[in-house]
Amino acid sequence: MSPLDANLSTADAGARDIDVFRVDADDGSGREYRLASYFQPIFSLAHRRPVAYEALIRGTDREGRVYLPAELLAQAPAGVARMQLDRQCRALHVRSFRRLRDEVSWLFLNVDPHIAVQGHRFGSFAQMLEESGLSPHRVAVELIEKIGRAHV
């Protein structure tokens, strides 16, 4: 079994890194989402092996409903909460990727363009990479497509 299979198997879910993201409502109530990283291998035909892994986030609410990335992002109000969710997802992906103990593959991250244009926010990301021991040259960032936005 490869390190990826071991990390992603449902039987191993107890060992998976999981974060909780909370969205507070005006009335003091709130919703919590358990965040988990999943990895899609990117294969090289020339190398005949995975050369990278695209990090994908999944959120699960208390009722067990699973949220795909766009649905999860829609649960966070624009502004600080959305920035916090993005930052939390990136940190979770880096921690989970490091657990694979793969020292040659790249990590592909999807980032909302609104967050990427605020470049000063990536300073903390560079620091987080340094603290995790993951070299920035092994990380690729993809700006996710926003349908219906003319300026993107």
Q: What are these model-predicted stretches?
A:
Residues M1-S2, R138:
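Regulatory sensory/coupling modules that transmit signals to nucleotide-handling catalytic cores
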Residues P3-A74:
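Active-site core of bacterial EAL-family cyclic-dinucleotide phosphodiesterase domains
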Residues N7, P41, L45-R49, R65, ...:
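A generic structural micro-environment signature
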Residues D61, Q75-V80, V111-I115:
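Conserved protein-kinase N-lobe ATP-binding Lys motif
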Residues M83-R149:
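Catalytic core of bacterial c-di-GMP phosphodiesterases, primarily the EAL and HD-GYP domains
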